[in-house]
From Swiss-Prot:
Function field: Histones H1 are necessary for the condensation of nucleosome chains into higher-order structures.
Protein name per its UniProtKB record: Histone H1, early embryonic
PANTHER family registered for this protein in UniProt: HISTONE H1 (PTHR11467), HISTONE H1, EARLY EMBRYONIC (PTHR11467:SF177)
High-level lineage: Eukaryota, Metazoa, Echinodermata, Eleutherozoa, Echinozoa
One annotated GO biological process: nucleosome assembly
Amino acid sequence: MAEKNSSKKVTTKKPAAHPPAAEMVATAITELKDRNGSSLQAIKKYIATNFDVQMDRQLLFIKRALKSGVEKGKLVQTKGKGASGSFKVNVQAAKAQASEKAKKEKEKAKLLAQREKAKEKGCSEEGETAEGSRPKKVKAAPKKAKKPVKKTTEKKEKKKTPKKAPKKPAAKKSTPKKTPKKAAAKKPKTAKPKKPAXKKAAKSK
């Protein structure tokens, strides 16, 4: 029993091989283009040839569509009464329907455009927020500023090393001070030859 019920559900879900009866009737009348109106027989023939329909089952729906179309003003009955006469499409009603459909399509297009714009704005705002949050992470990157500190330390070390070099020439300057002392000791040696000169003067007297 469960299998039979499942098979029935599947058959109901299948899409119809033809549009609704009202649409088929409207297309048949517009395509036949009869000035005096299209009869029920002409409408049935057109539907049977152009649509995959079992006329025995659809005949009742076609008659209902004709009656409802006349009541709603979509169709005009030129001859007969009920569904046995001739029918034409109400041009004014058709124009009104076309304008209504156009308006609905425009409204749908506007709604779609607004939704797309809203989505784009949402994406752009998300991108801006993401970009705004990124600089916060960049603030934590003053690690590069630590590198110049190393350079200053290196410069300080370089400055300290030349201070040690001038100490060596200071020792060299102390050595030339000892040399003039030796020259002073040599001067009394030159004064000794002056004494014999005085002796020579006495002898000459």
